[in-house]
A protein has these predicted regions:
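Active-site-adjacent structural elements in enzyme catalytic cores
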Residues: 1-143
């Protein structure tokens, strides 16, 4: 059985920080950002440790997902090619984080050929949102 706790207040998973080394490192970005962590522990280092939710392809919908800073231009181009498209525009970052997975699931259920998603601004919780979006798009990426 699956329990439905209703909508969540934050949306994306927590920040994971490695405190086992001399210099702490973020293993997975989340709601608590780098600036907030550095204000407590000082400058952060890097780590090669694998944490939950950090595989290259993760959080992926079934439908191809394209990240674009120009989603309307991409939509027009793809629709001209005869492709059916759904677009998710960036929102205020707390709202975007809170609704991200629900929006991706809803768009996935639409049965379109491609989901075009606009990345979040790269500030506050934006890097964590973009981390999840890059992972969601990774299995469809050619790089």
């Amino acid at each position: 059985p699956i329990l439905d706790g209703g909508p969540c207040t934050i949306g994306i998973e927590s920040t994971i920080v490695d405190l086992t080394q001399e210099q702490p490192a973020i293993l997975r970005p989340g709601f608590i950002g780098q600036h907030d962590i550095e204000s407590i522990v000082g400058p952060l280092g890097t780590s090669n440790t694998v944490a939950p939710g950090t595989l290259r392809s993760h959080y992926s919908p079934m439908t191809s997902l394209l990240l674009s800073h120009e989603p309307e231009l991409e939509r027009q181009k793809l629709e001209t090619e005869g492709r059916s498209v759904a677009v998710l525009r960036a929102q205020e970052t707390p709202q975007y984080a809170r609704n991200l997975y629900a929006e991706l699931r809803k768009m996935d259920e639409m049965g379109v050929d491609i989901l075009i998603v606009e990345p979040a601004p790269n500030e506050g919780i934006g890097p964590a949102i973009n981390d999840r979006l890059q992972r969601a798009a990774a299995k469809f990426s050619t790089d």
